[in-house]
Amino acid sequence: MWTAGNIIIGGLITGSIYALLAVGYSLVFSVSGALNLAQGAFVALGALVMYSFTNNAHLPIGAAFLASLCVVGAAVGLIEWVVIRRAVTRISHASLLMMMGGLLTAFEGAAYLIWGANPFSFNSFSGTQPVTVGKLSIPTQGFWVIGAMLASVAVLSWLLSRSRWGRGLRATSENMTAARLMGVPVDRMILLSFIAAAVLGVIGGAVIAPLTSLDYTSMASYTNEGLIAVSLGGLGSVYGSLAGGLALGVVEAVVSGYVSSLFSTAISLIVLIGIIFLRPQGLLGRVRGGRMDVAERVAGRIYAPPKLPYRWLASGGITLAVVMLFMPQIIPGGDMRAVNITGLFCLTIVGLDLLTGIAGQVSLGQAGFMAIGGYTSAILAVNYGVPTLVGLVAGACGSALVAVVLGVVCGRLRGMYLAIITLAFGILVEALANGLNITGGPSGIAGIPPFSVAGFAFDTDTRMFYLVWVLVAVALVLSANLVRSNRGRILRAMHSDQVGAQSLGLHITRAKVGVFVISACMASTSGSLYASYFRYLSPDQVGSAQSLTFITMLAIGGMGTLFGPLLGVALLTYLPLVSQSFANYSMLVTGVLLVVFLRYLPAGVWGGVLEGVTLARTRWAGRTAISGRPRAAGPDAVSSSPGEATPPGEVTAASELTVPGEGTSTGEAAADGGGHAGAPTLEVRGLSKSFGGVAAVRDVSFTVSDGSLTALIGPNGAGKSTVFNLVTNLYRPDSGEVILRGRPVTGLRPDRITSLGLFRTFQTARVFPQLSVLDNVLVGGYRLGRAGYLAQSLRLRRCRREETQMEARARRLLSVFGLAGRADERAAVLPLAGQKYLELARALMARPGVVLFDEPAAGMNDAETAELGMILRAIRDTGHTVVVVEHNMSLVMGVCDQVVVMDAGRVIAAGSPQAVQTDPVVISAYFGAAEANT
């Protein structure tokens, strides 16, 4: 009992430091939305600065503490002003998180250069004799730790609730834009939050230093512990952070006391992953959600490899192959090892670029898959005599299984939470490698045999060179094929807008699992070859710090460019290996480069080259602007020149919308026997939905007949778009059901609903801005392609045939909507009307049975609206069932067969346009009771 009490007291002391870290995390996140991965650096930095003031300047401990507060606070304030402030509103949360990781690495590198690798500690503030209560032994320094934590949290709580600055911080955390409009100095609030977090870190470092030793490696350790604590308790909750920190300290102490200290972190990480999977906001945190029908901010560009002529590719490939063939004779023997290590990391980085750069799934634990592959093959070879090739395959299979689990866990997570999961995964693998006997613990595994195939050993630098770089070339070719394929487009669409991609039929979890598996297998192969090349493997070689280095390599070369990150690998791998002086600065340089590229050069080196090439081609072509209006469709619609003007008012040919000879719509194919004119296609029965106690939709019911054009109208705030979100299951209804062609679809995933033939557009044009206009439409036809990842990576004949057919259909649809001349431009440059037409074309690409158009005329002038009306009629006339939410009454009354009117979340009228226009209840809803009685 007394032993357990001492363990718990030790856990509370350590947990108090974790609580201070977690509160700092929570404060910065609440105000700025940034997950400050440099928080742990403030603890070690504060203690190290104090040590310098006490030992070099001979200041008293109190004066040294105040001086440390000033130095660290000023440094953090300067960094916030120069780097972070504008990044908060200009880059995505995921990029911001990676940038904060770069700051942590920069702090580590600076601390290493200033204080070296030797750990430092202080004497206890009040002696070394513990206080004993019965058999409980409490270190006197523990009272300082717990007291400092309680006092800091109490003062912070008082300031947040009672002071003017506290009110400003709380207002900014609730709504940054609204706070700015109301005169709150938001930039100062962000600065204040970072300085306050730094102060909390310095306080923690000052009181914990007498109990433990601190050095530059402590920064990452405390960052990880604080992140676990705040994720457990709840981001944005001071008291949740306090509870999470104390609980984490106690759990780790109990595991260390009764199991092993080597497993305390691993068990905490497993708990963290489980909690984030079940409740991402933490145990006491609250959901910081937004509207699911409004796209999130995405930073940077998403590139597809340029489609070069085959002769160029063949000539370039042959030239490169010849150069690589003779490179071992050119490169000095001492540098071959550096070149081979560069190649091994290139193999990992190609997979990481697919995962993070192309698919947008930020992975801060990629080295974990290298560790799984390396340790699996090493253990099998050393302990059981298994051939290294079999070990490599086993490692890849093991990594694939872990990637499946990780992909499923991450399937429901986005942005920051996904990054936390992958970071926790990388740290977990490192912790297990350090703690398990079979891995050799911190000492690692030695005596690993060289990689061999059928008795041929790759036991020299030259042989390994050819093996590694052939694998890199194969990985690049397969990845480039995949990115240009149907699957690759959907991965890029998922990166641009996950909810938008899901609304087009993408199974998010399945897509994430697929790309995680591909990326993991590449990293695992690299890890296996890495272990056999060095004949040795230890946890620090494939630890979590290496994962952040991979992210830096990616950022330098250019995320999503495939070839660009190889430049980053060469810079950060080759130079430190051939230059010892550069190696001493590698951490600092790595961190600074990651911050600079993510903040100021998000396209990276190769991305900048592609930007320049694109700009030069555009200017050289002298392309003129196109109106973006739909052209008259007829026999010549497909071949019309891009700049040709079209007389407005001509009816779009129905044949162009159905694309002759390509089968029936998805909805018709999904229906049992198809529908017939006038039969109910879509039935909404008693739908209700409330948000925070406010009823947005109340008992809404209506029926849409097959082949009809129905409008859903009503004043602003009537609940029309919410009904669309309920029908497509972006929101789960509180009650009621939706019937599609006689089948209940309430509760089905959005991708399942689209597979049944129901597609939608959004109130705010939700195109994929970083994709080309043509690719946007092709994404809409994602389900028309049947080939899988492997077939499309190999570009089999059936894949090429599918691609040709889909592209032909997409170009015909673009011609119908007047966008054929802009097919290769980014969708972001289209005017609002052009983006609305692009959404219509994308929805029709999949041959839907039912289409929901949410305010398609928004932002259009009268001529464009008239043309839109003709398009809507043409879509209906081809057999599609159309439902529109629209405020333009001239358009609604001129083209619709049925009008459903909503007000205050209820249906108040339904019928023909003529009947609705004369309904007193409708007139009252729009113009008031007095007008209705006249």
Where are the predicted features?
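Transmembrane alpha-helices
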Residues: 15-25, 180, 184-208, 220, ...
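Glycine-rich phosphate-binding loops of nucleotide-dependent enzymes
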Residues: 34-37, 170, 175, 675-683, ...
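Conserved N-terminal flank of the Walker A/P-loop in ABC nucleotide-binding domains
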Residues: 23, 180, 350, 499-502, ...
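Transmembrane alpha-helices and adjacent helix-loop boundaries
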Residues: 94-118, 134, 187, 262-264, ...
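Short, non-helical or kinked segments that cap or interrupt transmembrane helices
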Residues: 25-47, 61, 90-95, 165-168, ...
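Hydrophobic alpha-helical segments within and immediately flanking transmembrane helices
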Residues: 14-27, 35-55, 75, 79, ...
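ABC-family P-loop ATPase nucleotide-binding domain
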Residues: 295-299, 303, 610-688, 930-934
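Membrane-helix/interface signature in polytopic inner-membrane proteins
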Residues: 156-194, 219, 477-515, 822-824
